[in-house]
Amino acid sequence: MKTRFLVFLTLLLSIYGWSQHQTNLVVKLDDDARELTIEQEITFVNTSDISWDKVYLLDWANAFSNLQTPLAIRLAEDFKNRFEFSSDEDKGFTDISSLNTENYIVSRPKSNPDVVILELLEPIAPQTSRSVNITYKVKIPLDDFTGYGKSSDNEYLLKYWYLHPAPFVNGEWQFYSHKDLNDFYGAPTQMSISVHVPSRLKAISSLKMITQVEQENRNSYLFEGLTSSSARLYFLESTDGFKRYSTNQVDLTTDIDDESVPTEMKVVFIDRIASFLNDHVGKSPSRELFISDKFYKENPVYGLSSLPSFINPFPAGFTYEIKMLKALTRKWVEQGISTHNRDEYWLKQGIIIHTIMKYQEQYYPNLKIGGKLSDFWGIRGFNVSQLRFNDRYAFLYLNTKRLNLDQAPNTPADSLLKYNQQLAIPFKAAIGLAYLNDYLGNNAVENSIKKLYSQSPSNSQNSRDFQKYLNEQTDKEIDWFFDYFITRHERLDWKLRNIEKYKDSVIVTIKNKSVYPIPIPIYALKNDSIVYKEWINGFIGDTSITLSRKAIQNKKLGAANRIVVNYEEIIPEFNPRDNYKTLKPFPAFNRPLEFRLFKDIEDPEKSQVFLMPDITFNIYDGLAIGSRFYNGNLLSKPFRYSIKPAYGTNSGKLVGSIGLSYEHPFQDRNNSLFSMRYGLSANQFSYAPDLLYRRGSAWLSFNYRPKDLRSNKRQSLNFRNVFVQRDRNDESLEEDPDYNVFALSFNQSDRNLRRSFSYSFGTEISERFSKASFRLDWRRLYKDNRQLNFRVFMGTFLYNDTRSNDDFFSFALDRPTDYLFDYNYYGRSEDDGLFSQQLILAEGGFKAQLDPAFANQWITTLNSSYSIWKYIFVYGDVGAVKNKGTSARFVYDTGIRLNLLQDYFELYFPVYNNNGWEIAQPNYDEKIRFIVTLDVNTFIGLFTRRWY
């Protein structure tokens, strides 16, 4: 009996002393084949109480194997086309040669081709271990796709290159595919890697180097360490760029550098950051840390390097320190807290940003985002220049909140919009932690973070564990934070509805405009100084509180003269502009009017009107130089107005526009109706020499978007009424230059990298005509980087009482008359000259000027183009045009298209059409058509599409 007990005790101690998986790898690089040959022994340790009949391995190197993997699909969704157009030789894959053995069978989940299943013929019993040997080859991809792989310098940066055990948590295996989100989640594994590379290369790793042997033909290395993330392995021609810094807390190896910062100062910064992290997060589980510049650039400090290198408005070494702060904090948290990095994305990211904010508060409390530039004349007047460094987090988060694109912090990382994944959700989570800490007091959040961190990284943690630790720190109720703030996306908003003033007290009524109850602070101010602050528990609808006059006065500052909700903007509120009420007697203003030059961030204490220089162009008015008065700032807002008076330098006339609009967002993601917009607009410009047009429009638009915000599917239903009044042209035969048109249209689109599809149909009704039209656009990108485009347009008049010789309202084959003044023509009335060659791809969409040019009965056209080399396309158009009293006319058109920047800068060269060989006819230069877009907002959309 005693012997059995000793055997059992020995086995139990060995299991608990060796609770992580272990793996030994022998890795050989074939430089010519861009291939790793790997012999791997994995010892699986089953510390659960469930037998394992199969185990899962993460094989993210195989994510590069074809265009159907989750990674390939993700890259295409983000409009990253390099992988899409790469050859098979440039991609990567894993080739497991030991497919079947006596001990296990290898397979892969259908939807996860970068995960390997080892089906064990004999299960691994609880509290036992089993060793498995696997031999395989890994084809290394080029680094063009994710930044990792073989570079053009013939060096190798390897991140996901071997088989790593997946974690087994709460009775189930947790695994997911590579999607370039830097969210690898593996089981803690003790690793030993023997690496052999050609002698021209040196190896360095995120694991500790144990031995190094350099020989004539090859260099050999041994790396060891414990990790739950993928072990990074770099093969470089020189590792001299990596420096080692030893401090009291850590020994750091890094190639993050700044030549302007002395080594001694770098050591001071690293030691200060490490000491701060040790005090506020916890002691690092490993003294040896490896942080590469590549690691930092995966999640950098956005905007820090926007200024030229010769302009440094920050304190000496600040840029280096903040880079190191971001990278070191991320490394510290990732290696010390084990969570499901995709489903619990907000938790780690929130802790990382929250810790960075605390550091900046301690060492740079008054530093502004512009540094010294914020004090320069001409810059210091802008509100944005006065933002403190920590204020940018709330500002950047509110960007998506104002666009109605906010998502709940607990949304899985792969379901987030790119902007939310990179910026908004980490920032919102961090702000939420700061908000919670202010409400609870006594450093409850920081203490809970340290408790979370103190648990062994071998123990997987989640939000429920964090909530438990918080409850241990306070008697206050905090369920609202996890039930509402973390799990909901709806906006937070309050309004200071009313103040009743009495001799000894003030009764304040606050309206909660959001859908859930969370605490809110209320303040009494003397000018801009806080006299009194009180937290109000969460409520729905309205609530009233009584503040005694005695409480809201201060011996030094005197009596308060303003009451404000959320004055310090602790909570990222949707609209703080209605949070202010004055205690001053009438006629004081709650928010005085302020005029500001150029666009800026809003000041919630004032009603702001922004003034911007504005320049437009058409050949009749010339440069229309004027000013734009509007209430729009750097963040979107529901109600907008814009007044743009201008003077035409050619016409010598007053021109311009005015617009009012309101957007009502719908926050219920289960309802596809995303927003409703309505408004009024009017403008006046020249449409011909010495002739003005005046257009007024009222419009209503319903916009639809799927629940999955990452989807590019869009729908809209639009109603508008357009009234046009034109100066009469004595040379024209028109009887009445004024008209009114009601238009109804429905649009649907799904624009993606591989395939773009959209269609619309609509109708227009006027006193003299009614018409219906249909348009379809389709584009396909092929593996060889060839592009095929189709466009179909069909239009018919339901009735047409216009004169037969007047084609102003007719369908156009190549150049729409634009009687609704929707298009940005630079010379809309030109019949010859350069500006008559401007092409607007609408209606018939032809490029050549053919006869008949218009259709007063019906028209059907098909436009197509196909790329033959890079930006050179061939195009072809065919169609039929029907006019009253004549038979339908078949038309066709072919030529060459230079697609320099699609929809923004294109040239069309007609070759052959109904007129014959255009290229052989005189005045060919007059037949070339061009597309040039000068709308900056449209151009910016080309670059922001992957973020929203």
How should these model regions be labeled?
Residues 898, 902-903, 925-948:
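Outer-membrane beta-barrel "beta-signal"
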Residues 411-503, 508:
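Amphipathic alpha-helical substructures
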Residues 518-520, 528-530, 536-537, 547-555, ...:
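Outer-membrane beta-barrel initiation region
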Residues 343, 349-431:
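Acidic/His/Gly-enriched intrinsically disordered linker/tail segments
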Residues 79-98, 108-110, 132-232:
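Extended, low-hydrophobicity, Ser/Thr/Pro/Gly-biased non-transmembrane segments
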Residues 193, 218, 222, 242-347, ...:
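Juxtacatalytic substrate-recognition/specificity segment
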Residues 677-688, 699, 742-867:
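C-terminal outer-membrane beta-barrel translocator/porin domains of Gram-negative envelope proteins
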Residues 204-205, 289, 478-479, 492-567:
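Beta-strand-rich binding/interaction modules
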